[in-house]
Amino acid sequence: MSDINATRLPIWGIGCDPCVGDEVTALLTRGEA
């Protein structure tokens, strides 16, 4: 289990970074504004 999780985490982070980053940026922008 740990091996699978350790392998999936980096891939998920890199693969979904753009879409997740956009959502986070939007939330941060709205919060700061």
Swiss-Prot record:
InterPro entries: Amanitin/phalloidin (IPR027582). Keywords: Thioether bond, Toxin. Processed by the macrocyclase-peptidase enzyme POPB to yield a toxic cyclic decapeptide. POPB first removes 10 residues from the N-terminus. Conformational trapping of the remaining peptide forces the enzyme to release this intermediate rather than proceed to macrocyclization. The enzyme rebinds the remaining peptide in a different conformation and catalyzes macrocyclization of the N-terminal 8 residues. There is a cross-link at residues 11-18 (Cyclopeptide (Ile-Pro)). Toxin belonging to the bicyclic octapeptides amatoxins that acts by binding non-competitively to RNA polymerase II and greatly slowing the elongation of transcripts from target promoters. There is a cross-link at residues 12-16 (2'-cysteinyl-6'-hydroxytryptophan sulfoxide (Trp-Cys)). Residues 1-10, 19-33 form a propeptide. One of its GO terms (molecular function) is toxin activity. Belongs to the MSDIN fungal toxin family. Pfam families: Amanitin (PF24112). This is Beta-amanitin proprotein. The typical symptoms of amatoxin poisoning are gastro-intestinal distress beginning 6-12 hours after ingestion, a remission phase lasting 12-24 hours, and progressive loss of liver function culminating in death within 3-5 days. One of the few effective treatments is liver transplantation.
